[in-house]
Every structure is written in structure tokens, then in C-alpha cells.
Amino acid sequence: MRQSTPGNVKKVNRRRPGAWLWCVALVCAWQLPSHVVVVPSARAQSSPEARRAGGRTEARRETDELVRRAMNIACMERELDPQGSAPIDEMQARPSLPLRHAEVVAGAERAERLLPVAKILAAESLRRLMREYGVRESAAVRAAFARLSQVRVIKPDMELRDNASVLYREPRTIRFGTIFLASLRSDEGMLGVLAHELTHVADGASGSLKTLFRGVAERAGRAASLRISARRGEELTCDLVGALAVRAYIARTPGVETLARRTARALAHNCVEHDHTDRAHLSPRTTMRALLALDPALARELTGDPAEPETSPAPAPRRTQRRAAHPIAPRTPRR
């Protein structure tokens, strides 16, 4: 009997593991492209999200362009408008005006004449914003509107220069710097500032509108890519109430002037060359940008772009926050 058979068998047995591993390697190498193909498939699955993100980016670019054009038109209209308000930085450069200066007297008379309608339109604008931002009716809110309705007095003040303010100890009075009175040359410009100050009166020492202020600050931060503190949110909300009140006033008092010119008067004092800020206020031009981003309808009234259907945004989330007690101090509309 040949002895080579067992040896042959052993040799075959030694080769089988190597052959098996070689086959596995071939199979893995053959399957590798199928794994590579998975990557495009995963990308294809994420393309709807990518398209949505691209759509949001495009919408943001369109809004930014609308706001930019609206700002340019507002400031161009101010330069051409005989009744255009002086920019804030120009007001600050002027010397103080005496109480009996003709322009001061004319401004005070304009403010007194517009105060009754300003109270109505400011209250309507506040109620609209409260609905949009999910601020519920409460005793504090009712007290806010009661305070607003009780304002009766316009008081010129040389020391306030280019500012307006309210004092907690005089809740029925709005004080105007004499330069400010002389520099707001149109009904629209004056009414916007009155509505701003009336919103401060409504808020009061107890901070009745703090939830609304916080909601506006958060939304403006998203709309205009800004970080807005609580106090700046308060001032921005007052400016927004002023702009909405002016829009309502224009709608109810048609005239021969263009819509763009009359709308620009609500913003014209922000058309500054020196765009400074402080702790309480956004800079004037940043304020204008935030307002137009918050209210694109206002921007379209300046540019003449077709109006889009207005939709109510989702209410801002409600959060509770303690408000620090404020001393009796002036409340100013802007810097």
C-alpha cells in the first residue's frame, strides 16, 4: 500500500484554510463597492433637509435685501421731504432751544393735537402685538391700558434736549426736549414718538409688559441676527408700537403724499451718520433694521413691493422672570 495517501490528505488539509481565507478576501473585496454606494444613498436621503435649509437661507437673503432697500429709501425720502425729521445725531449737535422758540411751540401744539389719536392707535397696536406674541389678558395688562388712557399732558423741557421721557411719579405727563419737539416736523414722526412713550407709560413701574418685551427681543434677534438685552427689547418694542401706530394712522388719513414718504417719517430720525448706541438702546440704524425685519409689511410700504398675506407667527414661549425694582427715572425712546 502506498504511504503517499495520508501525506496527500494532510497536504490538502493544510491548504484548505488558506484557500478559504482567500475566498473570503475575494468576497469582501467584491462587496466593498456595495458599501461605498451606500454613501450617496445617505446623501440622497438628507437632500430634503438640505433643500429646506437652502430655502431658509434664500428667504433670509431676500428679507435682508428687502430691509436694505427699505432703509435706503427711508433715508432718501427724509432728505427730500420738507417735513422729514432731523436725524438723532443732528439733533444732538444743535444748541438747546428756549421754551418759547417758534419751532418748539409748533412742536408742542402738534404733540397736544395728536395725543388723543396716539392713545387710541398705541392701544390698538399693543393689543395686536399681544395677540401675536401670546400675551394673555390679566390684571396687570388691564392696568397697563388704564395707565395709557390717563396721559393728558405734554410738557416741553429744555434739559431733555433731543429726548422724550416719562416719570413714574408723573404718569399722566410726557416730557419732550425742546430740540426734539422742533425736530419732529410731521404728524407721522410725532405720532410715532408719542406711541413709543405711551408704551413706557403702559408698562409702568411694575413691568406689566415685560413678557411682550422679551418676546419681541427674541424674535427680533432671530429676524435680524442680533443679540438684544431685556432693556433694549423694551425700547425696541416701544419703537415697534410707534411704527405700527403710524401705519394705522396713514391708513386712516389718506392724502396726496406717497405712501413711501409718509411711512419713512416713522423711521427718519434713525437716518444718522454717526451710529452710536448705549446700554438701553440699539443704535439708530440697527433699530431701523430690526423694525423692518420684524415687520416686512412696513418695509414693503417703503419699497413698493407687492404685499404678502399677513400670517400670525407662532406665539413666543411664555417664561416667568422677576423684574428688578426700578427707581423713578426718565424713559427715553432712543439714542
What do the PLM-derived regions correspond to, one by one?
Residues 22-34:
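Bacterial N-terminal signal peptides
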Residues 178-192:
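Short pre-active-site segment immediately N-terminal to the catalytic Zn-binding motif
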